[in-house]
Amino acid sequence: MHYKITYPCMPWELDYALLSFTQFKKSRHFDDPKYSWLKGGWYSIKDVEIFDGDIYVSYTKEVKENCWNTSLLSAKMNYVYIHFTTLFTSEECVNEYDNIDDEYNAHQSGGRIINLNNEIVLFSIGDFRSRYQAQSESSIFGKVLKINKKNNDYEVISMGHRNPQGLFYNEDKNFLLEAEHGPQGGDEINVIKLDYNSIQNFGWAISSYGEHYGGKNAPENKNKYEKYPLHKSHSEHGFIEPLKYFNPSIGISQIIGLANENQYVVASLKAHSLYFFEYNYNKKENNFNIVKKLDIGERIRDMIYYNNKLYLYLEDTASLAEISFN
């Protein structure tokens, strides 16, 4: 079934949203042995972007045996046959069994795509739980990259990210809003300036308002906190403070702008909610305000705002929901 909700007012004037939706049946059972090539679920599509006749797909790639990164494909859009070529990849990868931090999670991989213009795409990559790489300028992990479509060259525009899952480009003011999963708490909304002349560093895994899983009192975390202290200040350690952080974690996902200037919405997985907020880029202080939390009742994996409608991709029921603003 398909159900539409039409709001006669702005969303923060409502108390809740009760959604029905279009539901999709699973067509394959990936626990079947014949799908063992999925490597325990580490293979995954992260994002799809279609712009001006081109399609971009990001995914987790096994670069060599048991060693992974997040890569990007592109193709001309064709409804009969699509031939993809590699727009971005790297020989650098994180080995799921043999790495410095002795941890691995390919779901912590970013993969958000923003088409900036005819020459540039922006691309986020998580740290795969290889924390030290987020603070290495020579590594692709824990970064937001600017990639040239013509020659495949790239440069790092920001670093110190854990799992940058959401990106929104404000074309008028030329900045990005980035939504990032924290560890145990500490989900962030960050502002990345695209006219900045140096790499912007957001602090992971030196500073974070979250904690390592299990917290400081867990014996197994002693060495982890020595290497990655998760200071409760970014600016005191030379990093950029988040615009907003969430404790406890909301399981932050995509972030987008709405039709009215300075109005945005960020989605959540764990909290099953939308957070509508106002942000004034031109103000230095008191520039951020959450004006409404709207309960949806499901994990919201992604969303698109188009033609005064908000389309939600709901994970629990593999469904689409549409919210109209009139």
Predicted regions mapped to residue ranges:
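Conserved blade-ending motifs and adjacent loop-strand segments that build the rim/top face
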Residues: 285-307
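Short coil/turn segments at the loop-to-beta-strand junctions that recur within blades
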Residues: 90-95, 161-164, 208, 296-300
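Residue-level detector of Asp-centered blade-edge/turn motifs that repeat once per structural unit
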Residues: 50-53, 115-118, 170-173, 257-262, ...
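Beta-propeller domain segments
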Residues: 3-45, 127-289
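Blade-level signature of beta-propeller repeat domains, shared across WD40, Kelch, NHL, RCC1
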Residues: 302-326
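Asp-box/WD-like beta-propeller blade repeats and closely related beta-sheet repeat scaffolds
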Residues: 39-46, 66-115
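Aromatic- and glycine-enriched pocket-lining scaffold segments that form the walls
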Residues: 106-128, 137, 142
